[in-house]
Amino acid sequence: MGKISSLPTQLFKCCFCDFLKQVKMPVTSSSHLFYLALCLLAFSSSATAGPETLCGAELVDALQFVCGDRGFYFNKPTGYGSSSRRAPQTGIVDECCFRSCDLRRLEMYCAPLKAAKSARSVRAQRHTDMPKAQKEVHLKNTSRGSAGNKNYRM
């Protein structure tokens, strides 16, 4: 994945706008042509250059942008991929900092979406929502283990 706006691209846009302003003038000097040639050279070198890498804070910013509220992992989640053999563990730094990576590669490191919980799930109920008899049994079972008739403190 390349950066959204690289320096050569910004330079080309700036140069191109300036050149268009100059074209409106009837007289074109050699300095204007040189300036345009320099801009075209900068643009062509950025187009032929390989994809850029993301490291450090730039990598974290890109992951936060791509994954949003889900969060992300620095290593691939367990069970990732279809190979049964244990391959050496690679992480996002190996894939995007030492080599270039694209948007799909970044998305592979996003945490899965959490399933929406119902408003009244059983675990979400407070102790005050239970009938008194269930509440006493529940509190007794959570503070002590039982083996037969004997109660042991945990």
From Swiss-Prot:
InterPro entries cross-referenced by the UniProt entry: IGF-I, Insulin-like, Insulin-like_growth_factor, Insulin-like_sf, Insulin_CS, Insulin_family
SMART domains associated with the record: IlGF
Annotated spans, B: 50-78
Cellular component aspect of the GO annotation: alphav-beta3 integrin-IGF-1-IGF1R complex; exocytic vesicle; extracellular space
Gene3D superfamilies noted in UniProt: Insulin-like
Biased composition (Polar residues): 140-154
Localisation per UniProt entry: Secreted
Region (C): 79-90
Keyword Secreted applies: yes
Keywords, ordered alphabetically: Disulfide bond, Growth factor, Secreted, Signal
Spans annotated as D: 112-119
Biased composition (Basic and acidic residues): 126-139
Primary subcellular site in the record, as a coarse category: secreted
GO molecular function, one term: hormone activity
UniProt GO BP: cell population proliferation; insulin-like growth factor receptor signaling pathway; negative regulation of apoptotic process; negative regulation of release of cytochrome c from mitochondria; negative regulation of smooth muscle cell apoptotic process; positive regulation of cell population proliferation; positive regulation of D-glucose import; positive regulation of glycogen biosynthetic process
Chain positions covered by the region annotation Disordered: 121-154
Disulphide bonds in the chain: 55-97, 67-110, 96-101
Region (A): 91-111
Proregion residues excised on maturation: 120-154
Quaternary assembly: Forms a ternary complex with IGFR1 and ITGAV:ITGB3. Forms a ternary complex with IGFR1 and ITGA6:ITGB4. Forms a ternary complex with IGFBP3 and ALS.
Family indicated by similarity: Belongs to the insulin family.
Entry function: The insulin-like growth factors, isolated from plasma, are structurally and functionally related to insulin but have a much higher growth-promoting activity. May be a physiological regulator of [1-14C]-2-deoxy-D-glucose (2DG) transport and glycogen synthesis in osteoblasts. Stimulates glucose transport in bone-derived osteoblastic (PyMS) cells and is effective at much lower concentrations than insulin, not only regarding glycogen and DNA synthesis but also with regard to enhancing glucose uptake. May play a role in synapse maturation.
Protein name: Insulin-like growth factor 1
Organism expressing this protein natively: Ovis aries (Sheep)
Lineage summary: Eukaryota, Metazoa, Chordata, Craniata, Vertebrata
Gene name per UniProt: IGF1
